[in-house]
């Protein structure tokens, strides 16, 4: 298979389509699971190469191959860049898949399965950040952010919107390379068409205000809002906009970024859901006040990323030229970063769940079998006064029957205290101020919740709770977005007309424009 040079589109060649069987791979461990299937770490039996197998779930598809998988494959075969995940090939299972007992898996009795084969990455950003005691240094944060922006700039130049930027979709290997993954919600766009796009994209905590207000014409600026949320999360040590539903998410955005009006965001009052969500009272912008402990250059860049008006939001190209990346401490060389044990969000969630179950079982055991000298109150019948003979001790009173154990909700919160203190320059790497070439996340999407019915059709189901949790960065755990309506190319917004201006950028991004 021909491979395009870095930064160039490869439109003529496609990955191997079903020419090999999944039996060529040995599944080693599940690293993701979600709405669209499972992701496994696997080994190619002939070469011993470690890869990631993303199984495309077919049992719920009545009309053939899932549209999200088709879209992801078509886009990934075009994109070849060191900061974008590589789709290596497509493989199939020849017959119905079977469980460990050899029985056909329910819903797959008469079908085979299709797998997408990706390069394996050791971590996703959320799984890595959630490791106990993890503390990112400032040069490390700059290194990750520069790679994220470089990969996203490449996508936007080639007219691709990612539309699901979040920590679990940013994959990192043990060489420090970061890659964009999960293009299941990605779309091609064109600046000269004003087609309608769905606004039910991007995980809720990272969704920009224009989508929450009902816009169906948008461009690369939607991804840049998500990048701003990731940036603030890395610096702050926890997510910054944690709404439980669309109205609450917009409320949190307005509390931080101020109330939009025609002066600061022309056209906002004409957006479909503006009247449903406009705040009762005006609020001032508080980004600088809320994050005054950030470095000044970091704060300046964050302000430009979290701009309410998408037409004024900074582009990926301009963000790469921000002073933040060119002042001490400089971004470190990815290869200088420490190596960590594999950390995917699916695995860290699973470990926390197992720990909670063990603690719950220990509590239950303690209640059912108290120590021999424990002093538990005696059981009394309803309305029966407690009676005891004078001088008789109560040491051997009958134990209380154990009730049901406490219910523990699934966790999804900030990963503890600030993990990211101001650190020194660890390997201030800056040869010619060049850009760094360049990571899967996992876990189920929490339920979005429903709110009042400003949307057509009444409901307000959206792109799911906390960090979007979700499946793996290979794309298994996307939310249940409804893709209704004709989706053409995007309309207004920051178009793809990015020129490689500025001396800082001329050698940074290869030979693509």
Curated annotation (Swiss-Prot):
Biased composition (Polar residues): 497-513
GO cellular component: cyclin-dependent protein kinase holoenzyme complex; nucleus
Residue intervals of the Protein kinase domain: 25-325
GO terms of molecular function: ATP binding; cyclin-dependent protein serine/threonine kinase activity; protein serine kinase activity; RNA polymerase II CTD heptapeptide repeat kinase activity
Modified residues (Phosphotyrosine): 36
CDD domains (UniProt xref): STKc_CDK9_like
Disulphides: none
Residue ranges, compositional bias (Low complexity): 417-433
First-level EC class: transferase
Basic and acidic residues bias spans: 336-348
Name listed for the protein in its UniProt record: Cyclin-dependent kinase C-2
Gene name for this UniProt entry: CDKC-2
């Amino acid at each position: 298979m021909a491979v395009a040079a870095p930064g160039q589109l490869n439109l003529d060649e496609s990955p191997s389509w079903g020419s090999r069987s999944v039996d060529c791979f040995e599944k080693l461990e599940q690293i993701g699971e979600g709405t669209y299937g499972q992701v496994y770490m696997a080994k190619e039996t002939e070469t011993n190469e470690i890869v990631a197998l993303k199984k495309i779930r077919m049992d719920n598809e009545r009309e053939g191959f899932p549209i999200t998988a088709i879209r992801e494959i078509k886009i990934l075969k075009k994109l070849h860049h060191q900061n974008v995940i590589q789709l290596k090939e497509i493989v199939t299972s020849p017959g119905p898949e079977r469980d460990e007992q050899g029985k056909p898996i329910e819903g797959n009795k008469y079908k085979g399965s299709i797998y997408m084969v990706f390069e394996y990455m050791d971590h996703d950003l959320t799984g890595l950040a959630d490791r106990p005691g993890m503390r990112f240094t400032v040069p490390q944060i700059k290194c990750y952010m520069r790679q994220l922006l470089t990969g996203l700039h490449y996508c936007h130049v080639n007219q691709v919107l990612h539309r699901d930027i979040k920590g679990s979709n940013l994959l990192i290997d043990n060489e420090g390379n970061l890659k964009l993954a999960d293009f299941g919600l990605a779309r091609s766009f064109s600046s000269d068409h004003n087609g309608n796009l769905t606004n039910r994209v991007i995980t809720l905590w990272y969704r920009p205000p224009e989508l929450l207000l009902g816009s169906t014409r948008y461009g690369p600026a939607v991804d840049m809002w998500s990048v701003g949320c990731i940036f603030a999360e890395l610096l702050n040590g926890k997510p910054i906009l944690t709404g439980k539903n669309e109205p609450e998410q917009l409320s949190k955005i307005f509390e931080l970024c101020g109330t939009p009006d025609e002066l600061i965001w022309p056209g906002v009052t004409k957006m479909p859901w503006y009247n449903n969500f406009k705040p009762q009272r005006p609020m001032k912008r508080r980004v600088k006040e809320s994050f005054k402990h950030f470095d000044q250059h970091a704060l300046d860049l964050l302000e430009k990323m979290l701009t309410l008006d998408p037409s004024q939001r900074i582009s990926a190209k301009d963000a790469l030229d921000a002073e933040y990346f060119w002042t001490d401490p400089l971004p470190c060389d990815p290869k200088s970063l420490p190596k960590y044990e594999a950390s995917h969000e699916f695995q860290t969630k699973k470990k926390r769940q197992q720990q909670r179950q063990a603690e719950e079982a220990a509590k239950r055991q303690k209640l059912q079998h108290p120590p021999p000298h424990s002093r538990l109150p005696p059981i009394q019948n309803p309305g029966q006064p407690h009676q005891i003979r004078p001088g008789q001790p109560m040491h051997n009173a009958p134990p209380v029957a154990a009730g049901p154990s406490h219910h523990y909700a699934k966790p999804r919160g900030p990963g503890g205290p600030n993990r990211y203190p101001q650190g020194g320059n660890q390997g201030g790497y800056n040869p010619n101020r060049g850009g760094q070439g360049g990571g899967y996340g996992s876990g189920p999407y929490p339920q979005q919740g429903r709110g009042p019915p400003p949307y057509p059709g009444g409901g307000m189901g959206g792109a799911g709770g906390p960090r979007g949790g979700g499946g793996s960065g290979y794309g298994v755990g996307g939310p249940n977005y409804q893709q209704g309506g004709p989706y053409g190319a995007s309309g207004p917004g920051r178009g793809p007309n990015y020129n490689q201006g500025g001396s800082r950028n001329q050698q940074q991004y290869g030979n693509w424009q």
